[in-house]
Amino acid sequence: MLLCQKPTYRLLRYSVKRYVASLYSLRGVSTRVNLIHRTYATTVAKDNIDHNDSSPVFNNNEVRFENINASIHPILLDLKNKLIKGKFDSPYTILNDQPSDVKTEIFQSFEQQLSKALSSKSTPENKITLVDYLNPTLDNISSLLHLISNNTYPNNFLEFSNLSSNNDLIMQLFTQLLHKIFLQYRIENASFEKPKVDFSNPAEWFPEARKMKRKIIMHVGPTNSGKTYNSLIKLSKSKTGYYAGPLRLLAREIYEKFNSQGIGCNLITGEEVVPSIDKYGKVSGIASGTIEMIPLHKKMDLCVIDEIQMIADPLRGSVWTNAVLGVLAHEIHLCGEESAVPFIQKMVEITGDELEIKKFNRLGKLTVEKSNTSLQQLKKGDCLVVFSKKKILKFKCDIERNTRLKVGVIYGALPPEIRSQEASKFNNGEYDVLVASDAIGMGLNLKINRIVFSGVNKFNGSTVEKLSVSQVKQIAGRAGRFSAQHGSKEGFVTALHRSSLVYIDQCLKTPVSEISKACIWPTSNIWRQYMANDPHKSSLSSVYENFLTNVLKFQSDNFFISELDQKVQLLNLVAKNRLLSTMIIDDQLTISETPINFRTSVNPKLLKNTVIKFYETIVKRDCKSILDFDFLDLELLSQNSFVGTDVMVPLQKVDKLEDMHRLVLLFLWLSQRFPTLFIDKDSAMEVKALVEKRINQELVNVERANSFFSDRSNGYEPRR
């Protein structure tokens, strides 16, 4: 047995002291700890062993324990009788209460494992320490038995262990090993509870929030009523708080606004975390971020949850529901449409929170024009609302080719940073007209004089349907935005078609229907508990699919189950791939939230292949930078801005660059969740900025090509 050098020796003595304390405290004789510690040190000193020497503490006579099985046989018989009769003392009394068949099974397992351990290579005797006597394992039991047979174990160890003989010491070691084998048996044979998730009352998913008496203040009213402004004023005066918005763009807008006013505010989105640190190195207690990133585990003074009507959205609504039910804020400000009030009132009755409702009226008049308009009649300050990217770009080309108006575009697939730039150019007059999707309905302060609907039908992902009353009001309300500098401003609404204008007028006169049910889906923590009770260890995709089959019968007056097509599609990539199918459940839960949609891509195969490579990196636990993946088209990124007359060339490049941008954002999203695997985030941010720059250049090229065509058609000199 080797004695460690001084530093390690001190650490060993401290570790042994702590371990012995825990061991003896179970037996009620913790007062012996200091005594065994002092005596062990005295024994070492008395043996005149130099602590800097690596010589053995005990003499090893190198006498083999030839008949070890015969020697321990009587002890094994005594141990078996003790187990059968239930004669074990604390802390092993749990063995006494086991059924006879369990006792027989664990003792047989113990004998088999002991026999195997004695016949296999054991821990070298000169590596055995005092800790091994206190906490034996099958790996070192052979060496321990040999040392005991030669009386080369620590002096006075029997006395301090309340033992009278070597056989008693061996019995103690065997008892500890038997107990360990029993615990392993218990884990392996534990009966699983039937996995279930209770959807009847999702408020109980958040027990910490139920311990609090929270105050909920609703700020409700139409678009352009100042409802969010008032709650942000309250947030800016709080010590700790969070603004939860529906879009990354909106979160950044609040972040920049607060910091420009000297109010420290962090930015927290799925792709990046930007802390605000004061001159003393203290991180701000206020943050602005997306609703998905709201910290449900963290107590705070105030939380602002924007666009509360999204609680009924079948795709993302569960995030709002979980936020309202689970956020640990003393004061919660919910901003949005009045349609959400009745449901929140019902929810508060369940949670026991206090509720206050503040109603706001629109700041400025909104007028529906009597007649429809045309592309040729568009004027400066107009925003043409279109419901597909392809049509948005087509309308941009048509307007620029047939008028002398400069046109900006905003749509969902466009990177948020480019959307913000396009909005700024429209607001400061660089663009005359904006062609945009319903993405303008949330966030983006735009100086729009008139909203022009191209139509009232929208593809919802599976079918084409008419815009809801709520959607029409949300979009139309963007006209005539109020500003603190210029006050209220009248807004106007019209459409390209007479039938659309009639429908819009009806919607604006119709009260918004009340939200009757909220979307729900369990949090990752709840799914971890569910999967822990799954005896089949199924893949997460099959669990979701089986789960959905069972919950089709789910009926509730207050809630409905979230749509899972996108989650299941992502998880099927994992389940159908031999390597990815070995991914642990924790990682599967994380990647099920991957923010990517293959259907909106011009090259879904590229997206899928790259996503699979990202997931393989997670399974293999590789470290990779963004340049280690092959989705970047370096030739396209390095091209100089080219001005031509064929508008399709830059449009096709925009499509490719947007797909590239999606994958860069996904890399950044994964780097936030797997920072040791997806590395060199700085390079990824530089690539992101480069892709955004190239998208902006190609949009300018579209404008130039259209201008060239327009000027030639109308007999003007081409604009430069």
UniProtKB/Swiss-Prot annotation:
Q: Does the keyword Transit peptide apply?
A: yes
**Catalytic EC class:** hydrolase
Coiled-coil-forming residues are none
Q: Describe the disruption phenotype.
A: Leads to completely attenuated virulence in a mouse keratitis model.
- Annotated compartments: Mitochondrion matrix
Q: Where does ATP bind?
A: 221-228
Q: Which GO terms describe its cellular component?
A: mitochondrial degradosome; mitochondrial matrix
Q: Does the keyword Transit peptide apply?
A: yes
Q: Which UniProt keywords apply?
A: ATP-binding, Helicase, Hydrolase, Mitochondrion, Nucleotide-binding, Transit peptide, Virulence
Q: Where is this protein's transit peptide?
A: 1-40
CDD domains in alphabetical order: DEXQc_Suv3, SF2_C_suv3
Reaction equations catalysed = ATP + H2O = ADP + phosphate + H(+)
Which BP terms from GO are recorded?
A: aerobic respiration; cell growth mode switching, budding to filamentous; cellular response to pH; chlamydospore formation; filamentous growth; filamentous growth of a population of unicellular organisms; filamentous growth of a population of unicellular organisms in response to biotic stimulus; filamentous growth of a population of unicellular organisms in response to pH
Disulfide partners: none
**Any one GO molecular function term:** ATP hydrolysis activity
EC numbers for this chain: 3.6.4.13
Top-rank taxon: Eukaryota
Chain ranges of the Helicase ATP-binding domain: 208-349
What range(s) does the Helicase C-terminal domain occupy?
A: 359-523
Tell me the function of this protein: Required for intron-independent turnover and processing of mitochondrial RNA. It is a key control element in nuclear-mitochondrial interactions. Required for embedded hyphal growth, for wild-type respiratory growth, and biofilm development. Required for chlamydospore formation, distinctive morphological feature of the fungal pathogen C.albicans that can be induced to form in oxygen-limited environments and has been reported in clinical specimens. Plays am important role in virulence.
Extract the PANTHER family matched here: ATP-DEPENDENT RNA AND DNA HELICASE (PTHR12131), ATP-DEPENDENT RNA HELICASE SUPV3L1, MITOCHONDRIAL-RELATED (PTHR12131:SF1)
Please identify the protein, giving its name as recorded.
ATP-dependent RNA helicase SUV3, mitochondrial
Q: Which gene encodes it?
A: SUV3
